[in-house]
Amino acid sequence: MSKQSSCAIMGKSLSFSLSRGERADLEMPTDPLVLGVKRMMFDRETSTFLLISTVFLNINEKDSHLKILCCNCVSDLRTRINLPCVLIQCRKYNSEAFKYCILLLHNLNRVERLLSFELNHALDENTKIFDGPIVFWQYLNQFFYISSAIGKVTTISLMLSSIEWIGEIENFGLGFLGLAEPSEDKCTQKLSESDYEFSNSSLCAYALKSQEMLSNGYLIPLAYSTMVTHVHVWAAEMVDHQLRTSLIALTRKNQLILFQNGIPVRACQLPFPGPRSVQILDAGKRNRFFIVSFPSKACAVSEKKFKVVAKWEQLSLVLVNDFAGVGTEQVLVVFEDSLDADQLTSFTVTDFVKIWYSTKPLDCCEDPLAEEEHENYYLVLPALEGQLDNSFIFLNKIQQHISFKDKFIAKSWKALLNAVYGKGDSLPSDEMVKLDQDGLVPFCDEGEDSVPTPEENLPDNFPEPEHIVEQTWCHVLDDDLVVGAKVTSLKESNEMTLSLIMNQGNRSSFHLMKCHSQVWLLKHMKCERIQECTEIYLYKKLRNCGALFSWEQRTASEGILTIYCRSQGVLFQCLDHLIKVLPEICSFKYLKVENEDFLVDHLSSTLEAELVTFCSVSTSAFEYVRGGYNCRIRRTDNRAMTFLGRRAKIRQSKRKVQRERILKHLNMTVNGSSYAEMTLALAEIQLKSDLIVKTLANFVIAL
């Protein structure tokens, strides 16, 4: 039996182990190995971890020695869904070749063998699994990787001492960070002042596919990179062909350092030697903590104070997830004496803010006033935030009121001048002074609403200008000023121009660039049109999103945006970005969630309705034909009552025989309108069932 490996997903702890049957004690056992998956969930009422289920999944590897190298919860780039991933080593008895397989756990009853590859050497337990999933390892100073997209082992031809991170870079794609091997002359030189600049970093970024260097700047200065033992990239984005990063580095001097665009911002001295890895815990309300793991030890560093707030020793497992089910993350620390039990007996679950469940006392490193300061901070902060929000709301109302007054005064002044000079314009209606459309700020320039004054000495036959613009608005998005206009004319957009009046002596005009509401989708939301279906946009801003947008234009300044997502988590991420762009008055409507059970139930009911419709159509056609035939027979039967005796019986028998012959050769037809109604009803119900079957098939393929 191999060692036990654990990971966390959706607030549950998953433990993986390999075991055999009853003859596992033989030298070469023949029983097939099974993968045991133990799922545990935290119960807040009892403050304990309870065993939910234990499932054993067969692995078709006979006469082999199996070993779990590592497991991790990674993102499947095919579906953008986080799934538990396990890397298993298989070695046939009396064989020197090593076979490796990557398994994805979709649910408790289904395991997907994603990749299988063979090597002539064994991988150690330091092998890493990244999102993709992508497996990286090092052998004889050479780096290799395999991914689900390539499907084969690929060699990295670069001379690197280590690979610290691999993932998606926003606006670029897959990349990785590696420490370049220092040359001999650099090893003998002393560090100069230029060595401390971020442009001379030996930590470089590379493109995974082409293995070309993206940047060696804005990462880590050379003076720090020689001491780095681990790097965790917080954020990475390609801006104007330059890589911008925020990363956390662990050094040989037992330090945790935060770098932003190559500049060391903050540093913290760690309590234990030999830091190995770091995880980020997001406790909500801008409370983040860095969970640093050591051999059998761990500590937590606050992002705000950049100090150690807790530390633990004699540990066997450290995981970060939403174990309490409150919507924010917590850290699970499992001590050495309880990992193999069905129910964890020694653990700690905390977010260092409000949640703290522990079977052992927490070793805090704060001063004696930290607890009182911590309590007062979270008592005062919500009240201050609420007061600040109310102040912003009050300020917005004042600005709207002042804007309304200015608009009303301008319109009233225009109406007064029109009345003095005998013009027929009246006060604007309520719709003209309504200022809350689309949440945009109205333009109140005098140049737009001005009227000719007597000093201008205009002729009497001067034509009144055609007012084609009913209202104008502006909206600031990042560094751009977006101007919207509600037009009343039916002219084409290429016949219009938009003028920006800075002052009376400086006026500039330019052609109308966009007359629809799709600019924000393409630029600010970073969407891309699908060539095969131009009305659908692919949302590419999030690296783990994979959402589709459908924009239906209603008016020049109004439309309906439909979002198609594969999960609720992706939907929340899309809404988080949309709220920053959309106006405040827009409304949201949650349509429906189509899971597998819903589709199966809907399909069964639709098939039942299809069967009932088919039966009713057949019955209606038969009743129509039989009704016409019965009318013909009924007229013949009325004359049969006049005959008596034997002659009447003979004729009655003769008519019965003739009736059967007519029934055999009868052309059973219905009229056109009845047939069309029956066929249409049957076609509609069959179309519904076919659409549900297609949706269910796509759902199964996505899983």
Swiss-Prot record:
It is found in: Nucleus. It comes from the Eukaryota. Signal peptide: none annotated. One of its GO terms (biological process) is replication-born double-strand break repair via sister chromatid exchange. InterPro entries: FANCB. GO terms for cellular component: Fanconi anaemia nuclear complex. The keyword Nucleus applies. Keywords: DNA damage, DNA repair, Nucleus. Belongs to the multisubunit FA complex composed of FANCA, FANCB, FANCC, FANCE, FANCF, FANCG, FANCL/PHF9 and FANCM. PANTHER family: FANCONI ANEMIA GROUP B PROTEIN (PTHR28450:SF1). DNA repair protein required for FANCD2 ubiquitination. This is Fanconi anemia group B protein homolog. It comes from Mus musculus (Mouse).
